[in-house]
A protein has these predicted regions:
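Short, surface-exposed recognition loops and adjoining beta-strand edges that mediate ligand/DNA contacts
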Residues: 33, 60-79, 168, 199-218, ...
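TPR/Sel1-like alpha-solenoid repeat signature
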Residues: 145, 220-223
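Extended, well-ordered alpha-helical segments in internal regulatory regions
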Residues: 151-163, 223-234
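Bacterial Sec-dependent N-terminal signal peptides
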Residues: 1-28
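Membrane-proximal, proline-rich intrinsically disordered regions
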Residues: 19-68, 246
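Short, well-structured active-site flanking segments
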Residues: 25, 156-167, 239-240
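Conserved, well-structured interaction surfaces
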Residues: 43-47, 51-56, 79-159, 174-182, ...
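Tetratricopeptide repeat
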Residues: 187-194, 242, 249
Length: 257
């Protein structure tokens, strides 16, 4: 009996003196805290939303082209009927059950949030810790902001009043839809800011290792598109600004084309 009592006492002492630090070293997950270790890690994160942007263009092409007088996909015997989805786009008789508008909405907002996550992360990093100059680092951040503006310009064009999300922190985002004017002003401000931070295209041929990346001319071209359609979007004529940025591109202010 004494042996059993001693065993219980000993067990209790072992339990009470057990380790209380339950922090884990996780090897099967990558978080913000342990992802950014090298310059290449930062670069990879920045360009992840670009891959999504490339994919998301598919829905945009369908909505823009098949609903216009440029492209029509006609039924050929029993081919390309697909429940009449292509004909409905051509005749502007689509319904809430058609998937193309939802695909465009989802594609754009997934892209927006991918950009937001990267921008939030970049705001916590010190460029010199990863071998970046300040100009290089700000260029990468500006590319994400420009890409986000491109997604929002598509949303403005297709849906007008949409939610405005600028961070993974929900408190910084709109609680619901914003007006087209608010969205227009956000896009305009972002693109103008990024014009000073993005690189200028070098040379008359391709853009070397920066081919396919956002640069000053790309941001200016988005401003041209924004101002060209301002009367439709927000009821304001902005043709003078449209002409200004278009002429600057033609004059080579943002690189040779």
């Amino acid at each position: 009996m004494k042996y059993i009592k001693r065993l219980f006492v000993l067990s209790g002492l072992i339990i009470l003196s057990s380790c209380t630090n339950l922090d884990e070293t996780i090897y099967d997950q990558v978080s913000t805290e342990n992802y950014y270790n090298t310059k290449m890690d930062v670069t990879r994160a920045v360009f992840r939303p670009f891959e999504h942007a490339y994919w998301s263009v598919c829905s945009r092409q369908v909505l823009q082209e098949l609903s216009s007088d440029i492209v029509a996909t006609w039924k050929k015997d029993d081919w390309w009927e697909d429940g009449g989805r292509w004909s409905r786009l051509h005749y502007h008789t689509w319904t809430i059950e058609d998937g193309e508008p939802k695909t465009e909405w989802d594609g754009c907002f997934v892209g927006v949030m991918q950009c937001n996550y990267v921008i939030d992360d970049l705001n916590t990093l010190n460029p010199s810790d990863y071998g970046f100059t300040t100009a290089e680092f700000e260029n990468l951040k500006a590319q994400c902001r420009t890409l986000r503006a491109w997604f929002y310009l598509r949303l403005l064009d297709s849906f007008r009043n949409v939610p405005l999300a600028v961070s993974r922190d929900a408190s910084k985002n709109s609680e619901g839809q914003v007006t087209p004017k608010v969205l227009f002003d956000f896009i305009e401000t972002e693109l103008k800011d990024c014009l000073d931070l993005l690189q200028t295209k070098a040379g008359a041929a391709g853009n070397g290792t920066s081919q396919g990346q956002w640069n000053k001319a790309g941001a200016a071209a988005l401003l041209v598109r924004l101002y060209l359609n301002a009367e439709t979007y927000i009821g304001e004529e902005r043709y003078d600004e449209c002409a200004k940025y278009a002429q600057a591109i033609i004059d080579g202010d943002y690189g040779t084309y």
